[in-house]
């Protein structure tokens, strides 16, 4: 969603935002020049679309005007402007496939999988047939620049693939087993999302391309549920802790109190932020230690916020009742993807916590830093219900 009457506003900021998201993305796109034949590095990274599923466009992201490694390392990025500049310098080069085509091990798709699994940038050669000069912004995925339909796509060098990735591929592990195995051996969620999307994981007879948007949430969900099963045997932590962090116009408060596992995310979109131009919007979702069956009403941001909390609890070998507050401010003028949430909560939990005697004391302290005050009633009600039912 963009603010009302964009055609009338024409970038004059009548919506009240600090910057126009439409003009901002095209400001960088004007600098991109693309030839009919390209030979450029991929970070490596892949994009799989969802329009037309099960026939989708898929292919590598190629870096045209930026360092390919930095352009695919969200934990290093510093500002919204930098993210837009970096990501719109990446060209989506694609061809159309059926999602099941990966089972046939065609050379074109096999090379794409090898490129995606590589640990260093890989040069990609492509003959471009058609270019769409349209950028894409999404609440789950990172921003995307121009897209190009190619006559052909091939690797210009041999990629180096980690041994453990080759193991899960040739051992025919189920997808959730492969994800847990690789995650527990130190592979990042960003890497896992890419190889999951490329159809590298799972039993050979069941492998398929997975749209990028779906793969991001799937990895957060599958890995998170695996960690929940681990921490179910742990005792509650012994102190009430409060962490906070802010980046990219997203403010985070994280409260951990010594109780059995319960996770709750409160999401507050301030008026004039990207998805809520007219008024503040508040959403809440929660869970206990049982597997979360229904897809969260807060979309992929819920699973992205939950994962670093579960990582922290596993590291501390404890359970906790957890409240995460995410307040999105007007300075978040363009959606950047759920990595903003994952990294924000992760960095909050790496900071030095405040220690309190009770959850209520921590909640009061957190409230002072949250500008919207209406959310507290929702938290109080949810917490009392959780206690009543013994969650």
From Swiss-Prot:
Keywords: DNA damage, DNA repair, Metal-binding, Zinc, Zinc-finger. GO terms for biological process: DNA repair. A motif (PIP motif) lies at residues 382-389. GO terms for molecular function: zinc ion binding. InterPro entries: Nre, Nre_C, Nre_N. A zinc finger (C4-type) spans 6-20. It comes from the Archaea. HAMAP family: Nre. Interacts with the DNA polymerase sliding clamp (PCNA) via the PIP (PCNA-interacting peptide) motif. Belongs to the Nre family. Involved in DNA damage repair. Contains a predicted C4 metal binding domain at the N-terminus, which could be a zinc finger DNA binding domain. This is DNA repair protein NreA.
């Amino acid at each position: 969603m963009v603010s009302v009457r964009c055609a009338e506003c024409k970038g004059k900021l009548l919506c009240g935002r600090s910057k126009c998201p439409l003009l901002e993305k095209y400001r960088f796109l004007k600098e991109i020049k693309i030839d009919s034949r390209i030979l450029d590095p991929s970070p490596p990274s892949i994009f799989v679309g969802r329009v037309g599923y099960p026939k989708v466009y898929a292919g590598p992201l190629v870096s045209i005007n930026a360092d390919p490694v930095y352009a695919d390392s969200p934990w290093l990025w510093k500002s919204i402007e930098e993210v837009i500049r970096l990501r719109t310098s990446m060209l989506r080069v694609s061809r159309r496939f059926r999602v099941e085509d990966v089972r046939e091990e065609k050379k074109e798709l096999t090379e794409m999988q090898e490129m995606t699994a590589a640990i260093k940038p890989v040069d990609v050669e492509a003959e471009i047939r058609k270019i769409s000069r349209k950028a894409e912004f999404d609440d789950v995925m990172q921003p995307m620049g121009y897209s190009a339909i190619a006559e052909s796509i091939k690797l210009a060098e041999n990629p180096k693939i980690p041994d453990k990735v080759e193991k899960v591929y040739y051992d025919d592990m189920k997808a959730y087993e492969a994800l847990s195995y690789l995650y527990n051996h130190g592979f990042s969620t960003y890497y896992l999302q890419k190889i999951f999307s490329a159809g590298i994981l799972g039993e050979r007879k069941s492998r398929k391309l997975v749209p990028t948007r779906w793969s991001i949430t799937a990895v957060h969900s599958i890995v998170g549920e695996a960690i929940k099963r681990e921490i179910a045997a742990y005792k509650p932590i012994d102190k009430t802790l409060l962490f906070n962090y802010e980046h990219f116009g997203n403010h985070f408060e994280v409260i951990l109190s010594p109780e059995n596992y319960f996770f709750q995310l409160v999401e507050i979109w301030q008026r004039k932020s990207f998805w809520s131009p007219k008024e503040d919007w508040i959403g809440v979702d929660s869970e206990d230690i049982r597997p979360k069956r229904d897809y969260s009403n807060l979309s992929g941001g819920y699973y992205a916020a939950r994962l670093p909390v579960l990582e922290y609890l596993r590291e501390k070998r404890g359970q906790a009742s957890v409240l995460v507050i995410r307040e999105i401010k007007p300075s978040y003028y363009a959606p950047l993807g759920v990595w903003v949430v994952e990294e924000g909560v992760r960095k909050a939990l790496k900071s030095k916590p405040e220690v309190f005697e009770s959850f209520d004391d921590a909640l009061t302290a957190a409230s002072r830093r949250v500008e919207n005050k209406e959310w507290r009633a929702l938290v109080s009600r949810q917490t009392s219900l959780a206690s009543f039912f013994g969650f």
